[in-house]
Amino acid sequence: MLYWLYQYYGVNIFSYITFRAGVAFFVAFGLSVFFMPYFIKWAKAKKANQPISTYVAAHEGKKNTPTMGGIVFIISMICASLLCGNLFNPYVLLGLFCISCFALIGARDDYMKISAKNNAGMSAKMKFFLLFIVSLIITSILLYIGHNTNFYIPFMKYPLFDMGAFKIMDISVLALGFWVLVFLATSNAVNITDGLDGLATMPSICALFSLSAFVYVAGHAGFSSYLLYPKVVDSGELVILSVALIGALFGFLWYNCHPAQVFMGDSGSLALGAFIAFMAIVSNNEILLLLIGIIFVIEALSVILQVGSYKYRKKRIFAMAPIHHHFEVQGWAENKIIVRFWIIAILANIIALLSLKIR
């Protein structure tokens, strides 16, 4: 809406993405901080508590903590984006569609867990099906609007090959399949990581900050040309959505830091992972995402290795998976695990940002 003040009334300051992103940050932060206590109070009254695993004794004290806090920061982000974003931009509309759909799937899963008072939730097949369908819709729209299908290796100037060249019945199946995989992997990896107070929140903020920088450069003719970065027309507006989400996450972290007063639930973690994947795809950073989201990669790999090892060797690699539970079983304090993982995420994203210049 603020963009319309520039478009129709010539208020030039609202033409700047950076200014509107700053406004979006504080609006989303304010909404998240203000409404979260009301949500916590309502959730406690409704007994919308996170079912706690009986396998981790240290989590016994978390049993009455409400979940689904992701709904608040997602709505805060959407409101700020609607206020500050250019609603005629296809990437903005697709980004809002992406985060909304994944949040709804996560909310349904949370509701089923709360109703059943266990961690089962939606069946794995149904959850995968819904995530797959939404991912397929989003990636199909990206192809329809002509998004760049080049495959880039981090720190390299030129693409390795064009995924769009591999077609079946005039459909770029390689690009489509690869992007769907990125969506599914990232959304589930963030979901797995969300097991300690604030553990998924700060790495998500770091990832969104880095991806905001990449998307801004991609959408800026001057910067993309100077840095030899692949230009993506109109993508710069996504910075407003990303920065709004960062602001909303800081507001959530105010209540989610140890000891947490609220958990984000699947409604938050699935939506977060999906939006991070979306930003990575738009900025052509699907491979660099392995570094940008290194904590999510480590957490997901620990589960894959644990399950695979037990299935084929009948032996466990870790005391418990995901790996943050392994460290808990080893006697690490929760705060120590969280802060050390945050440090790893910050350092990894600093290295990732170097790829803007080192190409």
From Swiss-Prot:
Segments spanning the bilayer are 23-43, 68-88, 92-112, 126-146, 165-185, 198-218, 235-255, 262-282, 287-307, 336-356
Q: What topology does it adopt in the membrane? A: Multi-pass membrane protein
The catalytic activity, as recorded, is: UDP-N-acetyl-alpha-D-muramoyl-L-alanyl-gamma-D-glutamyl-meso-2,6-diaminopimeloyl-D-alanyl-D-alanine + di-trans,octa-cis-undecaprenyl phosphate = di-trans,octa-cis-undecaprenyl diphospho-N-acetyl-alpha-D-muramoyl-L-alanyl-D-glutamyl-meso-2,6-diaminopimeloyl-D-alanyl-D-alanine + UMP
- The source's superkingdom equals Bacteria
Gene Ontology annotations for the cellular component aspect, listed alphabetically: plasma membrane
Q: Which Pfam families match?
A: Glycos_transf_4 (PF00953), MraY_sig1 (PF10555)
Alphabetized, the UniProt keywords read: Cell cycle, Cell division, Cell inner membrane, Cell membrane, Cell shape, Cell wall biogenesis/degradation, Magnesium, Membrane, Metal-binding, Peptidoglycan synthesis, Transferase, Transmembrane, Transmembrane helix
Q: What is this protein called?
A: Phospho-N-acetylmuramoyl-pentapeptide-transferase
Which species does the entry assign this protein to? Helicobacter hepaticus (strain ATCC 51449 / 3B1)
Gene name for this UniProt entry: mraY
